[in-house]
Amino acid sequence: MVKVYAPASSANMSVGFDVLGAAVTPVDGTLLGDVVSVEAANHFRLHNLGRFADKLPPEPRENIVYQCWERFCQALGKTIPVAMTLEKNMPIGSGLGSSACSVVAALVAMNEHCGKPLNDTRLLALMGELEGRISGSIHYDNVAPCFLGGMQLMIEENGIISQQVPGFDEWLWVLAYPGIKVSTAEARAILPAQYRRQDCIAHGRHLAGFIHACYSRQPQLAAALMKDVIAEPYRARLLPGFSQARQAVSEIGALASGISGSGPTLFALCDKPETAQRVADWLSKHYLQNQEGFVHICRLDTAGARVVG
């Protein structure tokens, strides 16, 4: 049997709509991600378990893990009978790359089970295709960091899908999921079809400056450039209490904050453990809306998807 863990990810990072994403892991050792196991069988079977298994489609063919198996078999040109188990630890529609976790874990597990017939580039292309079935369009800002680890910048030129951007070891990512669902498709539909020239210029300046600051090792500058003129001005209205939370974490000392992916998870960047804890405490009390919500203090997950059994 092969068992693969795929970590949560925070896409966009305010400054890089659809082109930046970071894999994250809680500092307390909690596994924030999905696990898929694969073993040989006489015919295909899929079993779901985990905290959020009851939120998955009841029809197996609608489950993205089934679709991953089907697409992987197509890529190899043969049917591979396996029993798969999805441990669904990630809330759906959370802005933490939930569908990407399932897709990445399923495809890596299938590839490992079959002796790695597909290389990383081919696997990543399949991951983007399958994740796009859920979000409505192909983009790699969750699957790339989830698969490869760290911060990833989407390139999609010269056969290169993404490349790693150096992160900062001192950065702590406080992630607060309020316990409500935001559909990625709905969050995309709310965005305008056209943007003002000054917003396009600001977006380019922020993103170019952020990448430069990462490579020139200027964490304060990088954090200061994490501004969103593309999505947050429109999506904030979908997130109850978001604007107040941003103001509060800034006053506590967060370097930057914003919407993780399409929401509703809020991320706040801190460079001191005590600041991160104070931010986490405030968000736990004021941003969470129900028992399904949670707050984690995380660092970059530099390993990405990995075999755990």
UniProtKB/Swiss-Prot annotation:
One of its GO terms (molecular function) is homoserine kinase activity. Its EC number is 2.7.1.39. Keywords: Amino-acid biosynthesis, ATP-binding, Cytoplasm, Kinase, Nucleotide-binding, Threonine biosynthesis, Transferase. SUPFAM superfamilies: GHMP Kinase, C-terminal domain, Ribosomal protein S5 domain 2-like. GO terms for cellular component: cytoplasm. It is an enzyme of class 2 (transferase). One of its GO terms (biological process) is threonine biosynthetic process. Gene3D superfamilies: 3.30.230.10, GHMP kinase, C-terminal domain (3.30.70.890). It catalyses: L-homoserine + ATP = O-phospho-L-homoserine + ADP + H(+). InterPro entries: GHMP_kinase_C_dom (IPR013750), GHMP_kinase_C_sf (IPR036554), GHMP_kinase_N_dom (IPR006204), GHMP_knse_ATP-bd_CS (IPR006203), Homoserine_kinase (IPR000870), Ribosomal_Su5_D2-typ_SF (IPR020568), Ribsml_uS5_D2-typ_fold_subgr (IPR014721). The keyword Acetylation does not apply. It is found in: Cytoplasm. Belongs to the GHMP kinase family. Homoserine kinase subfamily. Catalyzes the ATP-dependent phosphorylation of L-homoserine to L-homoserine phosphate. This is Homoserine kinase. It comes from Salmonella dublin (strain CT_02021853).
